[in-house]
Amino acid sequence: MIKDRFENFDDEVRDLVLEFERTVLNDGIQFFDVDELEMIIDYYLEVNDLKPLEAAVAFAEKLYPDSIEVKIRRAHVAIAHQQYSSALNQLLALYEKEPGNTDLAYSLGVVYSAMDRPDEAIEQYLAASADGWQVGRIYGNVAEEYVKKQDYETAIKYYESALDYDGHDYITLYNYVDTCERQRCCGQGRKRLEDYVKRNPYSRDGWFCLGLIYIDLGEIAMAIDAFEYALAIDKSSSETYTELAYAYELMGDIGRASSTLLQMAENTIFRALAFRRVGQLYLRCGNCNAASIYFSKALAEQAEDVSSMAGLAESYLMMGDMSLALSTARKAESIDGANVDVLSAMAKIYDAKGDWEKAGTYYDELIINDQCTEQHCREYTDYLFRHRIYDLLIDFSEESFEAFPEDPFYCTYLAAAYFYTNRYNSARRVLPFVDVAHLSDLCPEIMTHPLLGPLVPNPQPPEE
């Protein structure tokens, strides 16, 4: 739809692009000045629509063969085609003629970034900021390069500076939240975003990102309020419904979580996704009958949604219908065998069948998949523990422990695995962070062990 195509662009860009497509792309005749063509080309670059991009650049080159701005955009076409060396050579040749051109410096920053050369990218981006144009966007790019260097503290400073210059850059907002999570400084992010929504009370992205920060800080009720504000501004945002439903799930209010996702089905174009997520919600709660209903609804909307097929297969497995579970999962596998939900379902089915070697093969494929989620990692950890594959569990979970040293899930499994492999000193390291009730189920012997038992934290009394 036209509205969706130009959602993040102003009316002038929209009108120019539509006029270009109506005339030039249909062999018509129309004059555009060089500034207008730059805007048209930049639109196609932004949305990565390569065929009209090529046509727009070729048209501009015919009209303005000596324009350095058009030549810069020719280099960006090479970047879009991942021809980074060609783009770099074109830009360096232009830079020799105009060494102070900030557009050239910015473009060099882009290509150095694509070539994973962050130091050179930072140098060029900062040179590009000298003219004071789009400083917010440039600082956001500089921050991303520092993230690549794993210098998160400096990245956060540049993200905050970027927001000071351009408070409406939603990409910077999202990246800022993500970096605060990595650096474990969500308190700092909270202060910044609370100030941001005071200054920009109608920013859907601002309220949404503040909700994410509240989730990370464990302030679920405040997260719900923030997501509700975001939905009041924009009822068509599927990601806001998803996060609001997750917040309700964390509060234990499955009914509100489900109704939120059903509102997503009513108010957005993502009906199949909404029904699938309701199914996944009920599956996590162990309500396989309700889950199967909503997975079926999702498939009625989108017949080849393999994630919904995988969820339906897991529902059948929980119902005890192994044959139907396996046939449904195999159908999903025949469509997309690399889908993480399909791999997870196949692993669980073969685990339940007692074919642990085949289950392990599916889990091995799942864990190295780029789309593997935290939930999948936890399922894999539990699988390794149940089958006493302790050494592999330790190798896998220690990586998660290093990243999240106070996560009770991995600490609990590590403590039990260390105990069963007689690594008592290692167990002492993680015992302060375990879930005591879960540990007593996994490894009751550790609770009365003369050396380790006294180190197990006292269970917290239930909240009144």
Outline where the language-model segments fall.
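Structural marker of alpha-solenoid helical repeat scaffolds
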Residues: 63, 96-98, 130-132, 165, ...
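Register position in tetratricopeptide repeats
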Residues: 46, 80-81, 114-115, 148, ...
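TPR/TPR-like (Sel1-like) alpha-helical repeat modules
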Residues: 232, 368-371, 416-441
